[in-house]
Amino acid sequence: MSKKGKVYIVGAGCGDFELLTLKGKRCISEADCIIYDRLMNKRILGFAGKGTEFIYLGKENTEGGLIQEEINNKIVEKALEGKTVVRLKGGDPFVFGRGGEEIEKLSENNIPFEIVPGITSAIAVPEYAGIPVTHRGISKSFHVFTGMTAKENSFHDFKKIAELEGTLVFLMGVKNLGLIADELIKHGKDKNTPTAVIEKGTTGKQRVVIDSLEKISETAEKEKAVSPAVIVIGDVVKKREKFNWFEKKELFGKNILVTRDTAQGEVFCREIEKLGGNSELLSFLKIEDQMHNFNYENLKNYQALLFNSPNGVKFFFDHIPDMRVLGNIKIGAVGAKTREELEKFKIRPDVMPEKYLTTELAEEILKITEENDKILVITSDISPCDDVEWSRKYNRKFEKFVGYNTNFNLKSKTDVEKILKDMEYITFLSSSAVKSFVNSLENDISCVKRLKVISIGPSTTKTLKKFKINIFSEALDYTADGVINILRKE
């Protein structure tokens, strides 16, 4: 009989993917199979290891027990295959997450499990809106309720709820907001009680609607508030005026499309989100490591080593057999991000040009090398690195090695157009991304006209103009930070 696997019921937190716990991240990285649904940030899946099986079982809040039973059975099925299974659940597994039902099924089949708590939206979402669920002198307690009905004509005892002191929090209650407010007032709750509806909390799309308990349903409907949303009822809502912090961030409310490859795109998205912006990653490029083809023993033949991108650094050191093979070789780098990648390996570049151009790096390395020195350039298959011309011009022996390939990662035209509808800005950090983007749109760029297009530098701008795409702005320094600075000034 095959050995049973183990299941980790993991709370994925809410909205902001950095609200995932460290233990949750570890479980994800070690999983053979991950079963997830819609109520979580999909970028969390990026922490999974290579070869992980992903199973999406989306569960809208209108669907019933049939879907949950399907999920229960799938978890058991994968565990019985001997796999380490992570069941990812938005928020916390035991706060209206139906985690208990999944565990009952595991227990019936004698499958070992662990529960990893998650940050619940009942607390985190109000916090991001500047609303504390408890506050000295205002609220000594808070009470969390589901805003949905399990069965028709089956709901809460609002008489008891209306009598409670402290803050009332309803999850998944937008659809029943009018009923909730009416029932609370009917059973004695002050109609003037401050009430907040927080939509898409903890994300760059967060929106807060506030009014009295009596008027909140009408106001929310007027403002077209939709789920997912958290409803907070109580005097603590008044604290938002002073405690609101998230919506004051520089990029809050800005919807920004990132077009980089997945690895660098994730980093760029995080920088946007640190500043409160809402980023959407649509990777139009796929990076393919080629450093496994390099003979590191040949490094002893070179006097200098140049890197023109973080990817080149990463792949070079991923395969290096022994750091000592570098010997006394001089190292040059283009760009702050390339330098930062080198510093991860305790290496500081000997030269860095002020302008973030590979041609400038070729000139800079002349200062610390001599005629006829051999200089190795780790680059991509599409990088403008003319080693033959440089060798002739500078009396050095430049040799380039293609450390990685940059391939188009084409998307369907329909998918791209759908995502662009919600965007305000689109960022391009390479000519290749522009070409792949236009290819994906089948050369129909009409959907781009209303967007503010930001270019990283002259080469990318030239490519954008070639395809008749209007540029809103070009970065002053040709880096990802330069693009961020444009967004900050907007």
Language-model region placement:
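Class I SAM-dependent methyltransferase SAM-binding "motif I" and its flanking Rossmann-like core
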Residues: D16, D92-V95, G99-L164, V209, ...
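Class I S-adenosyl-L-methionine
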Residues: M1-F17, L22-I119, K222, A229, ...
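A short alpha->loop->secondary-structure connector
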Residues: S107-N110, V133-H135, K186-N192, M323-G327, ...
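General beta-strand structural signal in soluble alpha/beta enzymes
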Residues: Y36-D37, Y56, V86-G90, F113-G118, ...
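Signature of uroporphyrinogen-III synthase
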Residues: Y8, C14-G15, T52, I67-I71, ...
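Conserved anion/nucleotide-ligand pocket segment
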Residues: E152-A196
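Acidic, glycine-enriched active-site microenvironments
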Residues: E30, K105, I115, T120, ...
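Short beta-strand/turn micro-motifs composed of small residues
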Residues: Y36, K89, P117, T146, ...
